[in-house]
Regions:
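Cytochrome P450
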Residues: 1-407
Length: 407
């Protein structure tokens, strides 16, 4: 295959490079901005990505795409969530979602979960100690965050398997397979998203006037200066919370443990210096981020980036994982350093669309990795590289088979 910069996106999304896309990102940074064979533009350098993430001329609204996918817009299914909208809609919906989740109205909600997260993590890890071999994804990294987010929202534990099936189908809709017609996969994703929204909307309806101590109850019963979410807004917002609340964290935990097992000196340092774990998680977000790139932003005007004019309306892809390994911003960027300081990575994005669930993901990952390295010691990788999920956007191992000593 050609190594022309015009084929970079095709090569980045090719599954053959899923285990190690970083050499392709280094190639992208040589060009800073690379026009692709289909007309889209890729940006891979730190300063340029940071500027574009804060540029109001760059739209996140799916309705501004030059060729919007009809399967992703009404009347086929639910409208886009607030991450797929621009201000002022984005700002209003985000504030309403944040009200029961974090500061200033619910400042202690995430930290109050620390005990429950620790209990769940320790129970899962203790179950692994009894096995000679196990899959970190299925046996730990998935059940931890999905249990936490479902408890936070108020989803009954009996419904968690169905929720995961829906979420997995929605995430599969983000996959890029060169040469494949994405239509059927995207339609299945929209159907799953709609089904999940209807389920959550019905569940929330039962809490209206009969609240319990969960986010669904708060979303339908608490008022504020911005009013309340409409039924449709409630559905799309809670779907986003559920999917974003566990899919990316599964990858962060799994990528984190894989990285530590590949770097045993870092693992031993964290065992000896547990106070470094928050900094180590920030380094994981830089080094092996669960979100590799933002599939499309849309310039609302011609924009000059690194001497290249990106025309109004063309698809713009910001490769966050490339920016987080830019040697002009991070010394020795391809080295995992759990003690790294000055680590302003793009692991949770930046600008108005930065991940509002970041505090929960950070806390879950800190507790998860601390629990694993203290209770399991140093399990052995059975496959390296492991089998990866197909998605180049939400990149992480599909399975991570490990063996205990003697297993």
């Amino acid at each position: 295959m050609s190594s022309s910069p015009e084929t970079l996106f095709r090569r980045i999304t090719d599954y053959a490079h899923r285990a190690d896309p970083y050499p392709l990102y280094a190639e992208l940074r040589e060009h800073k901005v690379a026009r692709q064979e289909d007309g889209k533009y890729l940006v891979g350098t730190y300063d340029e990505i940071a500027a574009l993430l804060h540029d109001p001329r760059v739209s996140s609204d799916v309705r501004n795409r030059t060729e919007p996918d009809p399967d992703l817009l009404p009347p086929q299914g639910l409208p886009p969530a607030f991450i797929g909208r621009d201000d002022p809609e984005h700002d209003r919906l985000r504030r309403l979602a944040m009200r029961p989740f974090g500061p200033p109205h619910s400042p202690g909600r995430v930290d109050a979960l620390r005990g429950d997260i620790t209990r769940i993590a320790e129970q899962l890890a203790d179950g692994l100690r009894e096995k000679e071999r196990f899959d970190l994804v299925d046996d730990f990294a998935f059940p931890l965050p999905v249990t936490v987010i479902c408890d936070l929202l108020g989803v009954p534990s009996a419904d968690i398997p169905q929720v995961h099936t829906w979420a997995d189908t929605v995430v599969t809709g983000l996959d890029f397979t060169p040469g494949e017609d994405p239509g059927p996969r995207r339609r299945a994703a929209q159907e799953a998203r709609t089904a999940m929204g209807l389920y959550l909307g019905e569940l929330a309806g039962k809490r209206r006037g009969h609240p319990t101590d969960d986010m669904l109850s708060a979303l339908v019963n608490d008022g504020g200066p911005d009013g309340r979410l409409t039924q449709e807004e409630l559905m799309v917002t809670t779907v986003l919370l559920l999917i974003a609340g566990h899919e990316t964290t599964v990858n962060l935990i799994t990528n984190g443990m894989l990285t530590l097992l590949r770097n045993p000196e870092a693992l031993e340092r964290l065992r000896a210096e547990p106070e470094l774990m928050p900094r180590a998680v920030e380094e994981l977000l830089r080094y092996e981020p669960p979100v590799q790139f933002l599939p499309q932003r849309t310039p609302l005007a011609d924009i000059e980036v690194a001497g290249v004019t990106i025309p109004q309306g063309v698809p713009l892809v910001l490769v966050l994982a490339s920016g987080s390994r830019d040697p002009l911003r991070f010394p020795d960027p391809d080295r995992f350093d759990p003690g790294r300081t000055d680590n302003q990575h793009f692991g949770f994005g930046s600008g108005i669309h930065n991940c509002f669930g970041a505090p929960l993901a950070r806390l879950e990952t800190q507790i998860a990795l601390t629990t694993l390295i203290n209770r399991l010691g140093s399990p052995r990788l059975l496959e390296d590289p492991p089998e990866y999920r197909n998605s180049p956007v939400l990149r992480g191992p599909r399975h991570l088979p490990l063996a205990q000593a003697g297993g």
